[in-house]
Amino acid sequence: MAETLTVEVMFGGGAELLFNKVKRKEIALPPLKTFLPDSQNQNWTLKELLIWLKDNLLVEREELFLKDDSVRPGILVLINEEDWELHGQLNYELKENDKIMFISTLHGG
């Protein structure tokens, strides 16, 4: 069976408030088929990472972070400091030691 996949997730711009004020966390993802046996993918993608975050780290108001199977509009996603749109968004296949940042660009007044 495959080993765990270690990635670092970071939250900023207020998104950290949805994750118990955690700004940075290194996580060891289990083999994908262990976490999601029915997944069509063989390897972790950002889509599965969002499910894992929802199930394991998200503690406040899911609707402020997720919409359907993606992040809510107004959440900027960076993969190793580059816009996720350059990497296929939800289809990006996670690699060991990737750094995934979620930044809220919406602020109340």
UniProtKB/Swiss-Prot annotation:
Name of this protein: Ubiquitin-related modifier 1 homolog
Predominant location category: cytoplasm
One Gene Ontology cellular component: cytosol
Location in chain, cross-link Glycyl lysine isopeptide (Gly-Lys) (interchain with K-? in acceptor proteins): G109
The record's account of how the chain is modified after translation: C-terminal thiocarboxylation occurs in 2 steps, it is first acyl-adenylated (-COAMP) via the hesA/moeB/thiF part of the MOCS3 homolog, then thiocarboxylated (-COSH) via the rhodanese domain of the MOCS3 homolog.
Keywords: Cytoplasm, Isopeptide bond, tRNA processing, Ubl conjugation pathway
Protein's organism: Bombyx mori (Silk moth)
Modified residues (1-thioglycine): G109
